[in-house]
Amino acid sequence: MRLFGKRGADRVAVVGAGVMGLATAHALASDGRDVTVYEQFEVGHNRGSSHGATRIFRFAYPNEHWVRMAQEALPGWRALEEESGETLLELPGLLEFSTDPDKSSRDALDACGAPYELLEPADVEARFSVNVPPGMTALFQPDAGVVYAERAQRAFLRGAQGRGAKIEQGVRVDSIDDVDAEVVVVTGGAWAQQLLATAGIALPVVPTRETIAYFRLEGKPPSVVAEIANGHGFYALKDPVHGLKVGRHKAGPPTDPDLQAAPDPEIVTEIAKWTGERFQLAEPGPAAADTCLYTNTMDERFILERRGRVVIGSACSGHGFKFAPVVGARLAALATG
């Protein structure tokens, strides 16, 4: 099936209406472009990588590249808040646990001028009711917390539509050749690989199905990351329904995104054990569990580039959401430059 939009030099199609696709459409429409977004399910669906109430926002990364990108993203989120009239960020701070101070975010934060505190375990317990793992150091960074993910997607969507962008839901694009546009931006997440292959483009990513669990916890907990940079570390963040959302980074198996699967009970057990050991005020048993998709590159860096009339927007590896304002602007620039 060929998908026809208006003809003209500035016609751009975006395939995939997760947060990156919506951010790209918002940026393109803000620049006066003729934009059509194609989504195989519906905006806000639970089959991909963007669903759920919250995502971590943080400056704390061991690599300066990510710190600076997060610093660039923050004013983008604030501008979207002002435009939408909604609170999209809540920033009570983030605790980072690491076995090796030299592999923590300390040096990168210093290089980027971002504030932080190095805390003793007793200070962490007193301030946050969180236990520091034995043998680990604790770093607190205040420019962190959560992005309200569902609100953020709606804000990008409304802003794009208000500037003339069209959203075609329930339309699956099976081939780049089916899209009648001057430029096609592919932000299909775990489905991008198979779509790009139809244009002869090999995308070096591995989709995995990850498990998360929710726990009842009162108050505003800080976000927490523990050894994320060194492998399959744990992370936690506020959930507005249950209190706390917890996952184990990159612990899930490779998957076909067209298949659906239940949360992995073994991973839920591991998550529950970690949560019970760290969060003094969390109820011990999970209140719920869910899955999401990661689209992993070898080094967790994003693939944002143009090949002919195709722009590739693979910005995930399990940590992309916070960067959506930046990624959307960069993909829009690639599409129109």
Give residue ranges: language-model regions.
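Internal hydrophobic alpha-helix adjacent to the cofactor/substrate pocket in enzyme cavities
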Residues: 325-337
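Active-site substrate-recognition segment that forms the wall
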Residues: 26-30, 87-89, 190-309
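Short hydrophobic core segments
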Residues: 15, 38, 179-191, 195, ...
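Glycine-rich phosphate/pyrophosphate-binding beta-alpha loops
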Residues: 62, 310-324
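Glycine-rich FAD pyrophosphate-binding loop
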Residues: 30-49
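Helical element adjacent to the flavin cofactor pocket in flavoenzyme catalytic cores
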Residues: 140-174
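Dinucleotide-binding Rossmann-like beta1-alpha1 core, especially the glycine-rich loop
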Residues: 53-127, 135-136, 233-234
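Beta1/beta-strand and adjacent pyrophosphate-binding region of the FAD-binding site
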Residues: 4-20, 36
